Amino acid sequence: MIVKTDRTSPTVSVAGAVKHNSDLETPAGEEGVSEILDGLFSYGTKTLDRLAFQKALDDIAANESAGFSFSVNVLKEHFPRGVELLADNELHPALPDKAFAVVQHQTADYVAGELQSPGYRTSRALDLALLPAGDPVLRQTTPASVKKVTLDEVKQYHAATFRPDLTTIVIIGDVTPEEARTVVEKWFGAWKAVGPRPDTTLPAIPRNKPSAANVSDAEAVQDSVTPYIL
C-alpha cells in the first residue's frame, strides 16, 4: 500500500490493481471468463443488490469501480465507508444468475463484432507474425467460447485470480498513512490468498523472420502502415 497525503481538498482517492494475465490464468476452454467477470461487478455484492449498493454509494457521494483495476473517490469524512463498499464489491461480488446470462450474451455479441474489426484483425496479424505457435497471447476469445463459460467457472476464476499478494493499493488525499492503513486493514485485512501464486509473466519471444500482412478496411479513406520491430 502506498499513501500520499495531500490536503488540497477534503477528499480521498483510492486506486488499486490486481496483477494478472488472462492469457496465462484462464483455464483451457474458458476463454472469455475474464471479460464476463469484469462485466458482473456492477451488479452489487453478496450483502447489497445492485440498487442497494448504488444507493449506498450515492449516500456518500462516492464514485466506485471494482475489478482487476479498482477505485473509489470520496470525501474524507466518508473514507471508511467508501473503502468498506469498495472491499465488499471487490471481494464479495454478487455474481447473480440473471445478470450472468445478460453479461454473457452482451460479451458474446461484443466479441463477435470485435473479431471483425480492422483494428483487431491488424493486431491479430501482428501477433501471428511475431509470436511462436502455442504462445499464450495467441489464445483467442470467440462468441462460442464465451457461450460455453458457466457461472461456476466465473466464480472459480474470481477466487483464483483475485489475491492480496498480487495487489497494490495507492491512496492519495486528505488522510495520513496511519489513518489509511487502519481503514484498509479493517476492510481488506481478512483477504487471504488461496493456493499457489499464479504465473503472470509471459514467456520471452524468440527472434522471428520479417513478414508483412495486409488488412482490408472498406471504410478507411487512406492506407495506414504499422511498422513493428521486435
Residue locations for each model-derived region?
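Mature N-terminal segment immediately following signal peptide/propeptide cleavage
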Residues: M1-A15
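M16/MPP (pitrilysin/insulinase) zinc-metallopeptidase core fold and M16-derived inactive scaffolds
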Residues: A15-R81, Q116, P136-Q140
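Buried hydrophobic packing residues in well-ordered domains
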Residues: G16, E35-L37, L57, F70, ...
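Short beta-strands and strand-coil junctions in structured, solvent-facing domains, enriched
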Residues: N21-E25, H92, P96-D97, P177-E178, ...
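M16/insulysin-pitrilysin zinc metalloprotease superfamily fold
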Residues: Y43-L48, V72-Q106
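Scaffold signal of the M16-like zinc-metallopeptidase fold and its non-catalytic homologs
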Residues: G44, G82, N89, E114-P164, ...
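Acidic/histidine-enriched alpha-helical segments
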Residues: R50, Q54-D59, A94-A112, S123, ...
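An aromatic/glycine/proline-enriched structural segment found at the starts
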Residues: R139, T168-L230
